[in-house]
């Protein structure tokens, strides 16, 4: 008789073990922003890239990569939340990774599977692929918590966001 393998995870994966403090630093660098929204997603992405403290060449490069990624598949998770990010982070000439937390006054249609328009975004830009995957995994893990859509809909301040992320990731 064959023994069944225990497939339950006993220890966190390498990505989950990534230090929450590194994500927090990236979120601090990116800041918390309130945008009008209500336009089409390309206009919103142009507005997002305009928030970056980089020259126009880098902003345009990020914009083009965001558009390519979004055309490939929507970055909307559902429940009005999205994580826009370029497909190829290592090609960007960034000084440091950052995550911009954004709340929209008017939602934008990002073609989410649940058909709900997006009102909150966590815009991820990474210097290298490994960190990109780690941050993306951590952000998605937090945003998939059942209480998060309601919490995010209240437009928390940055400290409240950090506390919520810390509770899930630490």
Where are these regions (language model features)?
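Cytosolic covalent-transfer regions centered on His/Cys nucleophiles
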Residues: 1-170
């Amino acid at each position: 008789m064959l023994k069944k393998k225990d497939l339950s995870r006993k220890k966190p994966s390498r990505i989950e073990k990534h230090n929450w403090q590194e994500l927090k630093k990236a979120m601090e660098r990116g800041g918390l922003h309130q945008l009008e929204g209500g336009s089409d997603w390309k206009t919103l992405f142009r507005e997002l890239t305009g928030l970056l403290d980089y020259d126009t060449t880098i902003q345009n490069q990020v914009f083009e990569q965001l558009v390519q990624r979004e055309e490939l598949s929507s970055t909307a998770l559902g429940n009005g939340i999205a994580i826009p990010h370029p497909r190829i982070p290592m090609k960007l000439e960034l000084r440091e990774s950052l995550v911009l937390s954004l709340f929209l006054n008017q939602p934008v249609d990002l073609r989410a599977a649940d058909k709900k328009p997006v009102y909150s975004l966590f815009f991820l830009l990474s210097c290298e692929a490994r960190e990109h995957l780690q941050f993306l995994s951590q952000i998605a893990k937090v945003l998939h918590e059942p209480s998060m859509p309601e919490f995010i809909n209240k437009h928390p301040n940055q400290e409240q966001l950090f506390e919520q992320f810390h509770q899930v990731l630490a």
